Amino acid sequence: MRDLKTYLXVAPV
């Protein structure tokens, strides 16, 4: 699930 980590990482919150 690399997409999830990328999203979190990108999430400003």
Curated annotation (Swiss-Prot):
Keywords: Chloroplast, Membrane, Photosynthesis, Photosystem I, Plastid, Thylakoid, Transmembrane, Transmembrane helix. The keyword Chloroplast applies. It is a single-pass membrane protein. It is found in: Plastid, Chloroplast thylakoid membrane. Its main location: plastid. GO terms for cellular component: chloroplast thylakoid membrane; photosystem I. GO terms for biological process: photosynthesis. The keyword Disulfide bond does not apply. The chain crosses the membrane at residues 7-13. May help in the organization of the PsaE and PsaF subunits. Belongs to the PsaJ family. This is Photosystem I reaction center subunit IX. The gene is psaJ.
